[in-house]
Amino acid sequence: MKKPFYKVLYVQVIFAIVVGVILGHYYPSLAVDMKPLGDGFIKLIKMVIGPIIFCTVVTGIAGMQDMKKVGRVGGKALLYFEIVSTCALVLGLAATHILRPGVGFNIDPATLNGKEVASYAAKAHGQSSVDFLMHIIPNTMIDAFAQGEILQILLIALLFGSVLAHLGERGRVVTDFIDGITRVLFGIVHIVTKLAPIGAFGAMAFTIGKYGVGSLVPLLKLIGTFYLTSVVFVLVVLGAIARFTGFSIIRFVGYIKEELLIVLGTSSSEAALPQLMEKLEKAGCSRSVVGLVVPTGYSFNLDGTNIYMTMAVLFIAQATNIELTWMQQLTLLAVAMLTSKGASGVTGAGFITLAATLAVVPTIPLSGMVLILGIDRFMSECRALTNIVGNGVATVVVSAWEKELDRAKLRAALSGNGEAAAGEAARV
């Protein structure tokens, strides 16, 4: 029996976002006090992200007959990430050249106050590529879970799952136990997800109440350019990849609409990570591929962040009337391919990454970041939305490459017959 429309989660989230915007606009002081509602919801989701990634990856790897598959899946995923990330970086650069959102500002760099962005610049210089790689190794297993470090948890899960696969039947009891824990954790996620409208309301009310719609007006062209470019990336680049793989990007976006609305309301792609993993399994992707690709993608496949980086750098150059040579722009692309990974998992990662990228183009002052500091919060929603769609598509593609994509399940899920697919997935 079909639910009444007002009981459907995505309808509730849309309503909550609208109410949050209204409250933030008309009663900003009250709206700012709603921040704990959004923060609380994100914390509830984050408390199960680590255990879910661990259990999903462990059971997926433990069930593999060929351990070479782990390396093969990881290699294919990283290759895909690098190619698509490069496309996102180039598209951001091209769109800014064509639409020129920074032209006409005529800002003198000497008049900019860089104190507000100094902390981001310090963090950018504080973490090298070696530091990033060393950070993947946790001090202790417990510390990785306590800090919620996704890549550290992934490393532990890879080792744990590999040992269970090597033990075979002797490790079956442990594997079955972890599989049972996985079902319990997803049950918790289902309960917490019912609170998504409250979290979306609190986060959106706070954003509008604190920053105000008026703060958007001077930089509307940049915001519009970024949103338009992200839509083009999803529909054209990811759309072409999806069509080549055998599914529709429009239907895929419709399939994960609840997760996208949660991300829209909270500005956090992590808030929808557990639900995304579960839905990808129900759509026919193998558990082992989902467990490896999705968590890794959250650090290495940030398509929205990549578009933002090259666009923001070129916008600052245009606004301050600084001409970049083609060689400088190619250098910018090369460095951005590295920095977009190096600052992942750090608070304020988008701005830290931008600071690290600007550091290699000395003709553009770091203080120029202050031009977009005020609107960064409004652009973060689009970054997060693009990131989550990109990671979802990546998982389906790698599953198809591994010939572990159940296309019948995928067609059923994307055509709206998700109930049957979900029931079958639950039995498996």
Swiss-Prot record:
Its main location: membrane. Pfam families: SDF. Keywords: Cell inner membrane, Cell membrane, Membrane, Symport, Transmembrane, Transmembrane helix, Transport. It is a multi-pass membrane protein. InterPro entries: C4_dicarb_transport, Na-dicarboxylate_symporter, Na-dicarboxylate_symporter_CS, Na:dicarbo_symporter_sf. GO terms for biological process: L-aspartate transmembrane transport. One of its GO terms (cellular component) is plasma membrane. The keyword Cytoplasm does not apply. GO terms for molecular function: fumarate transmembrane transporter activity; malate:proton symporter activity; succinate transmembrane transporter activity. The chain crosses the membrane at residues 8-28, 44-64, 78-98, 148-168, 184-204, 222-242, 307-327, 355-375. It is found in: Cell inner membrane. The keyword Transport applies. Responsible for the transport of dicarboxylates such as succinate, fumarate, and malate from the periplasm across the membrane. PANTHER family: AEROBIC C4-DICARBOXYLATE TRANSPORT PROTEIN, PROTON/GLUTAMATE-ASPARTATE SYMPORTER. Belongs to the dicarboxylate/amino acid:cation symporter (DAACS) (TC 2.A.23) family. This is C4-dicarboxylate transport protein. The gene is dctA.
